[in-house]
Amino acid sequence: YSERRFEPVIFTFFLFFQIHYFQRAFIFPLLLKGKSKMPLAIMSMGVLFNLLNGYMQGKWIFYLAPETMYQAGWFTSPWFIIGTLLFFAGMLLNWQSDYIIRHLRKPGDTRHYLPQKGMYRYVTSANYFGEILEWAGWAILTCSLSGLVFLWWTIANLVPRANAIWCRYREEFGDAVGERKRVFPFLY
């Protein structure tokens, strides 16, 4: 165990990370309505990614970051304030977007619907935008290369998926998609 684990700033980073993953690992699955199964290969890749990423984030925060970097003054730094605002804005956007998707269908309905509420008015993958915003906030609030790498991995994973969703929506719903972008409002 790191001797730094209870330093206030580092402990705060740890709590932020744990809030995200507690919700994603324990709460989110309980909220899902469908009975579809996830392929073992996809699940295994997710587990591997999270093990590697968790190791990388923890190694930086608890061991490699300079001991003078995350002192109490960090809480009032622009990095921490802006990063925290983005992190939680992204988290809440992600949760709201997931809620909207989960409530598109009534029980027994199997049709696809185009989400119309929240950030879905601007992009077809609002949940992905929230996730990207969240990890951009993480990269800023930790001001770390490991946070930046995590953000890059998130973008590299979610932007192509957002493009596939946008193309599928265009094919299925045509002009109803309107001017919505894929994942970044007003941009892409």
Regions found by a protein language model. Give the residues of each.
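Membrane-helix and juxtamembrane interface regions of eukaryotic multi-pass membrane proteins
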Residues: 1-49, 188
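Functional transmembrane or membrane-interface alpha-helices that line membrane-embedded catalytic
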Residues: 30-58, 65-69, 109-113
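Hydrophobic transmembrane alpha-helices
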Residues: 1-6, 49, 68-188
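Juxtamembrane membrane-interface segments at transmembrane alpha-helix termini
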Residues: 25-30, 55-56, 161-168
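Hydrophobic alpha-helical membrane context
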Residues: 35-36, 62, 137, 143
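C-terminal TM-helix exit segments that contain a strictly Trp-centered aromatic cap at the helix terminus
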Residues: 56-60, 94-97
